[in-house]
C-alpha cells in the first residue's frame, strides 16, 4: 500500500505534523537526513500508520501519485538543498509543500523553478507552535489553486477547527501563504510587546503583586481581550521556579530573541512605504532588550524624572490599562491587515482578508475573540482601507482612547518605557490627522534638494528658489 503523504524534516514541528496527519487517518511516510530523529519518532508511535524511510529514493517511491511531500526543514539553504535532491525523483503533477518559515520571496523563486518542471509548489504558513502542529495549527497555503486542491483534503483535516470550520483556506498565488504567515508573526511581535507593557504598568506603576496581576489577566481573558497570549501570560505569572521557589518570571533574563520573521515584516513594510510602526517598534524593543550590559550601566548614569508620591486609584487604573491594551492591540492588528491589503494590491494577490481573520481564530499564536469582529468588518466592507475606521472599532477607540492616553502620559511622567503603547497612540492620532506637518518636510526637501512639491490649490509639480 502506498503512503498518502510524506514528511521530510523530523524536528519537533515536523514530527508533530507527521503524527497529526497519522492521527487523522493518513498513511504517512517520514524521512530525515539523520536517522536518529526518525528513530526517535518511531518510538513515540501508538498504532498510527507512519512508515520510516532512510533513503530518499525509497521514501519518494512509497508515495501514491500524484505525490505530496511536506517539508518541515530549516528555512533558507536547507530548503533549497532538499528540493534539489527531490527534483530528479519527482514527476510532473507531484506536489512539494514547504511548511517552514521561508521568506515569501524565496518561495516565489522556488515556485517558478519547480513550475518549469511541472512540479507543484505550495508555500504553507503554519502557526501554532509544537502543540498546534500536533493538535491542529492555523494553515496558510499559497500557490496555484489547482495544486492546493490536491493537498486540501489533508491540510484541512490536520488544521485547527473552530466550530465546523477548519483554520485553513487558500490564501493566494505563489508566495502569498508565506507572506501571510510573515505578517502574522509581525502582529504577534506587537501583541506580545503590548501585553508586556501592560504587565509592566501593573507591576511597576501600580506595584501590584504577581498573583494579583495574574488574576487580572485571567479576568481580562473572560472578556473582549480573550486570546491565547492573554491566557498564557496569566499562567506564566503564576509559575514558580523549581530551583528557587521564586516566581519564574523573576529569574528569566530580560533579553528577548527573535528568528527573523518580525524583521522581514518590518523590512517589507519599509520597502513599500507601509506604516507598520507598532510592529517595527516591537522589533526595536527586542533589539534594545539585547543590550543588557549597556542598560545596566546606563541606569546609574542617565537621570529620569524625580520620583513623586502618587496615589492612583487601583481599580480605575486597572481599567485604564485594559483599555490601553485593547486599543493598542486593535491598532497593531489594523497595521497588520493594512499591510496585507496594500501588499495584496501591490502584488495582485487578492488576499481574502475576512477569511484570513477567520483562520487566525484557532490553532495560531495570535488567536483572539475579536478576530470575529475583524472578519465581519471585511465581510461588510471588502475594500476597507483600515480597521480603525470600521464602525465597531471606531466606537471602541473613541471610548478607550482616554485609557491609552492616561497610561502613556503616566509612563512619560514617571520615566517608564512603553514603546508600543506610545507608538499605537501616535499612529492613531497620526491616522486621524487630516492635515499633517508633511508640508514642511516637503518644503525642506525642495529647499536643499530641489525635490519639488505639489500644491493644495492647483494641479502640477512646483519648485521654489528659496534663497530669493
Swiss-Prot record:
Disruption phenotype: Cells lacking this gene exhibit no detectable phenotype on glucose as the sole carbon source, and they grow normally on gluconate. The gene is gntZ. NCBIfam families: gnd, PRK09287.1. One of its GO terms (cellular component) is cytosol. One of its GO terms (molecular function) is NADP binding. It catalyses: 6-phospho-D-gluconate + NAD(+) = D-ribulose 5-phosphate + CO2 + NADH. Substrate binds at residues 101, 127-129, 184-185, 189, 259, 286, 445, 451. Disulfide bonds: none annotated. NAD(+) binds at residues 9-14, 32-34, 73-75, 101. Keywords: Gluconate utilization, NAD, Oxidoreductase. InterPro entries: 6-PGluconate_DH-like_C_sf (IPR008927), 6PGD_dom2 (IPR013328), 6PGDH_C (IPR006114), 6PGDH_Gnd/GntZ (IPR006113), 6PGDH_NADP-bd (IPR006115), 6PGdom_BS (IPR006184), NAD(P)-bd_dom_sf (IPR036291), Pgluconate_DH (IPR006183). Its EC number is 1.1.1.343. The active site is at 181 (proton acceptor), 188 (proton donor). It comes from Bacillus subtilis (strain 168). The keyword Cytoplasm does not apply. This is 6-phosphogluconate dehydrogenase, NAD(+)-dependent, decarboxylating.
Amino acid at each position: 500500500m502506498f503512503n498518502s503523504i510524506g514528511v521530510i524534516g523530523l524536528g519537533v514541528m515536523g514530527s508533530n505534523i507527521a503524527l497529526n496527519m497519522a492521527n487523522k487517518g493518513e498513511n504517512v511516510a517520514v524521512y530525515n537526513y539523520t536517522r536518529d530523529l526518525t528513530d526517535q519518532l518511531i518510538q513515540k508511535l501508538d498504532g498510527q500508520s507512519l512508515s520510516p524511510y532512510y533513503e530518499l529514493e525509497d521514501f519518494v517511491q512509497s508515495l501514491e501519485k500524484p505525490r505530496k511531500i511536506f517539508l518541515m526543514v530549516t528555512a533558507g539553504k536547507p530548503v533549497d538543498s532538499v528540493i534539489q535532491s527531490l527534483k530528479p525523483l519527482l514527476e510532473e503533477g507531484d506536489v512539494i509543500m514547504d511548511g517552514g518559515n521561508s521568506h515569501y520571496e524565496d518561495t516565489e523563486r522556488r515556485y517558478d523553478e519547480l513550475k518549469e518542471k511541472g512540479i507543484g509548489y505550495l508555500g504553507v504558513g503554519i502557526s501554532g507552535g509544537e502543540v498546534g502542529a500536533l493538535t491542529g495549527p492555523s494553515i496558510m497555503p499559497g500557490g496555484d489553486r489547482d495544486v492546493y486542491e490536491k493537498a486540501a483534503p489533508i491540510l484541512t483535516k490536520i488544521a485547527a477547527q473552530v466550530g465546523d470550520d477548519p483554520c485553513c483556506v487558500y490564501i493566494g498565488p505563489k508566495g502569498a501563504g508565506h507572506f501571510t504567515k510573515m505578517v502574522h508573526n509581525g502582529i504577534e511581535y506587537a501583541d506580545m510587546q503590548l501585553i508586556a507593557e501592560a504587565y509592566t504598568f501593573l507591576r511597576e506603576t501600580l506595584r501590584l503583586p504577581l498573583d494579583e496581576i495574574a488574576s487580572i489577566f485571567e479576568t481580562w481573558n473572560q472578556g473582549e481581550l480573550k486570546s491565547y497570549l492573554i491566557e498564557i501570560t496569566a499562567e506564566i505569572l503564576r509559575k514558580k521556579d523549581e530551583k528557587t521557589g521564586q516566581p519564574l518570571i523573576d529569574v528569566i533574563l530580560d533579553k528577548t530573541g527573535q528568528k527573523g520573521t518580525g524583521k522581514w515584516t518590518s523590512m517589507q513594510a519599509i520597502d513599500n512605504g507601509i506604516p507598520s510602526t507598532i510592529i517595527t517598534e516591537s522589533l526595536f524593543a527586542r533589539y534594545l532588550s539585547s543590550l543588557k550590559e549597556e542598560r545596566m550601566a546606563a541606569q546609574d548614569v542617565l537621570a529620569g524624572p524625580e520620583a513623586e508620591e502618587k496615589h492612583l486609584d487601583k481599580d480605575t487604573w486597572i481599567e485604564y490599562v485594559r483599555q490601553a491594551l485593547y486599543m493598542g492591540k486593535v491598532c497593531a492588528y489594523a497595521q497588520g491587515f493594512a499591510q496585507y491589503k496594500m501588499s495584496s494590491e501591490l502584488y495582485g494577490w487578492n488576499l481574502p482578508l475576512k477569511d484570513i481573520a477567520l483562520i487566525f481564530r484557532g490553532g495560531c499564536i495570535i488567536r483572539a475573540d475579536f478576530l470575529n469582529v475583524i472578519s465581519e468588518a471585511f465581510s461588510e466592507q471588502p475594500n476597507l482601507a483600515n480597521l480603525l475606521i470600521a464602525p465597531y472599532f471606531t466606537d471602541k477607540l473613541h471610548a478607550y482612547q482616554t485609557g491609552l492616553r492616561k497610561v502613556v502620559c503616566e509612563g512619560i511622567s514617571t520615566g517608564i518605557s512603553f514603546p508600543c503603547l506610545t507608538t499605537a497612540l501616535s499612529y492613531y492620532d497620526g491616522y486621524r490627522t487630516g492635515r499633517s506637518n508633511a508640508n514642511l518636510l516637503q518644503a525642506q526637501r525642495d529647499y536643499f534638494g530641489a525635490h519639488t512639491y505639489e500644491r493644495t490649490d492647483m494641479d502640477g509639480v512646483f519648485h521654489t528658489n528659496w534663497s530669493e
